[in-house]
């Protein structure tokens, strides 16, 4: 059995989730079992139905559609509970590839139990490849990563007032 490595895609640039989902597609195309947790994301995103159709196990959502900074304490508690339930369910599944999208942001915003997240990452089965995305990852993730790729934004259409486009940004 090959050793599963830890990938970290992080920074303020576009492409972190895109890179992670591209790897999911590659793994599924190679017959691998893929489990994805999308922290703090709800709504429609074009890749999710296709990845599910191809066999990925996907856990996502939040309590409501607000950003965390807009949530009431009750909504934050419900969202945190949902994130922890999703992560616990995901790590109970057999996986060749585990993707934890926005895990760093979930930790930074106290929307996931850090001990559970560390267990998912640091105590995963030996052959399980793991991918995390984050804006500003905690030091323990930077230290643990086998691959650490920083996505840096130099220019983005949003800066010109161009909104996210279906099929491109989501």
Predicted stretch roles:
Residues 2-93:
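Conserved P-loop
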């Amino acid at each position: 059995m090959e050793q599963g490595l830890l990938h970290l895609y992080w920074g303020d640039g576009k492409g972190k989730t895109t890179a992670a989902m591209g790897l999911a597609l590659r793994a599924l195309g190679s017959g691998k079992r893929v489990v994805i947790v999308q922290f703090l994301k709800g709504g429609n995103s074009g890749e999710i139905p296709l990845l599910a159709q191809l066999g990925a196990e996907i856990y996502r959502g939040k309590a409501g559609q607000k950003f965390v900074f807009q949530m009431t304490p009750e909504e934050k508690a419900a969202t945190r509970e949902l994130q922890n339930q999703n992560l616990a369910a995901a790590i109970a599944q057999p996986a060749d590839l585990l993707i934890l999208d926005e895990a760093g942001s979930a930790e930074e915003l106290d929307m996931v139990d850090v001990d559970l997240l560390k267990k998912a990452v640091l105590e995963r089965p030996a052959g399980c490849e793991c991918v995390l995305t984050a804006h500003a990852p905690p030091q323990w993730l930077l230290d643990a990563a086998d691959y650490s790729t920083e996505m840096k934004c130099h220019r983005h259409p949003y800066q010109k007032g161009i909104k996210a486009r279906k099929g491109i940004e989501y």
